């Protein structure tokens, strides 16, 4: 996605750039494991979180000034069985 150079992901996270309030907040809800990873409902849970962020309704998890949100979800084993990979980008209009 181009957030940092190859190999710089660790230092980026260590500097706090992926935390709430950082330059690129990642998983402010705690991610899929914090939700019990409900498999079939995973994508919907991700979209719900992103919608809450864009509406400014995420409470203590709120990312300040959220205008664009990216969701990635996949299922199955690509190349071995039927699988799917989806990337959704949501953007606040006003």
Where are these regions (language model features)?
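Claisen-condensing/thiolase-fold acyl-transfer catalytic domains that form or cleave C-C bonds
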Residues: 1-94
């Amino acid at each position: 996605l181009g957030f940092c150079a190859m190999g710089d992901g660790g230092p980026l996270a260590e500097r706090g750039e992926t935390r709430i309030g950082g330059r690129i907040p990642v998983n402010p809800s705690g991610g899929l494991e914090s939700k019990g990873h409900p498999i079939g409902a995973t994508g919907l849970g991700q979209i719900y979180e992103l919608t809450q962020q864009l509406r400014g309704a995420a409470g203590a998890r709120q990312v300040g000034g959220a205008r664009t949100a990216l969701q990635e979800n996949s299922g199955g084993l690509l190349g071995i069985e039927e699988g799917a990979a989806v990337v959704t980008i949501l953007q606040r209009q006003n």
